[in-house]
Amino acid sequence: MTRSVCLALLLLLLPSLTLSAPAPAPAPVEARVPFAPTPFVGSDGLRHLAYELHITNYYGDTGALQPQSLQVFGDDAETPLLSLDAPALRDWVRPSPSGDGAISIAAGKRMVVFVWLSLPATGSMPHVLRHRMLLGTERHGSVELDGARVAVNAAPVMALAPPLQGGRWLAHEGPGAAQSHHWGSLVAVNGDLTIPQRFALDLVGVDERGRAVRPTTRDLQHTRHSDWVGYAAPVLAVADGIVRAVRDGQPEHPPLTAQPEPSSLTADGLFGNYVVLEISPGVFASYAHLRTGSIKVKPGQRVQRGQALAQLGQSGNSAAPHLHFQLSNKATFEGSEGIPYVFQAFDDFGPESEAQLFGQGDAWKPGVAVPRGNQLPLNDIVIAFPPR
């Protein structure tokens, strides 16, 4: 009788036992976050963390790895702050997968995941982030990365005055766009791999219709610099500081024409005419593509918040007149890491596409101006800074 009862109990337990799949083996990868993220408030009112997770597939025996999902956790929580499946991951990795192909990390290769965390405006901020990624293998089934912890940098970001005055400006290639040439550009120079332009903005002047070129212009392929709304606008110091680097005398290219290849991945190779200010110890504001002959300051000079530094132009690696603005932790472009910041005040008129800059596609319809304070404009919104 006892033997029959035991056998019945065993049969009842078997279904539950067979449902418990073994945990995936630890992934044979190296994973790390090279530069700790710092939270900032975006123009959507949310707090954001933007950073990169580097994953290297070391072993040839494993074969190619296929990332299937990514979860990001705060501290010791088991509820993820972010969950991405394989299709969603495609938009946030470099190298980008070709065509409709699956994401894959070949043996001996590295993949970079650009992580964009959006958190409520209020509430606690995690102290540490942890990453869990499930990867498929060619020979060994699924494996799992669980770790790659990184501490969140709790230092406050700098609140800046406007780099331009009044007017309307498209905040192009801005934060939140992993495929942009700013955040998406890793710079490998002399042993360092960094992202100097992580939070850079290309500020393109627009009129009340959202057009970058004045309405008298008939042929976009043959415009003059003066046809562009933002050209020659005064460029201003965003804070008190010391001029650390200046370059002038570089020519400006005709708008919307093929650009020469950069001579180097440095400020001299990319920025054309530029000014770099140190606005706090270890915090540098870079202004690039300035108008030839317009720079008013010299290295070592002290400047005050709102002081005119130069004029907006189109020198260096630039297809059209605009101001490239960024904050980083070194005076040089190469070897520096882009750091977040906020502007003390601007108006937000809503999103605009690059095509709408030139009157193509649906006409841009500005939203009601929303005042923003101590926020960073996110990618492709039209903003206006207060007049001086």
Where are these regions (language model features)?
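Asparagine-centered strand-capping/turn motif at beta-strand->loop junctions
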Residues: I55-T62
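Zn2+-dependent peptidoglycan hydrolase active-site motif and core
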Residues: D240-R291
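Short, solvent-exposed loop/turn segments enriched in Ser/Thr/Gly
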Residues: P34-F35, G45-E52
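Short histidine-centered loop motifs in beta-beta connectors
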Residues: L236, I279, V283-G306
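Acidic, glycine-rich catalytic/binding loops that coordinate metals and/or anionic ligands
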Residues: A155-E173, S180-A188, R214-T216, P262-A267, ...
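Intrinsically disordered, low-complexity Pro/Gly/Ser/Thr-rich segments with frequent PxxP/GP/PP motifs
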Residues: T79-G123
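A structural signal for short beta-strand/turn segments enriched in small hydrophobics and glycine
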Residues: G241-V243, G300-L312
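Terminal connector regions
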Residues: S118-A159
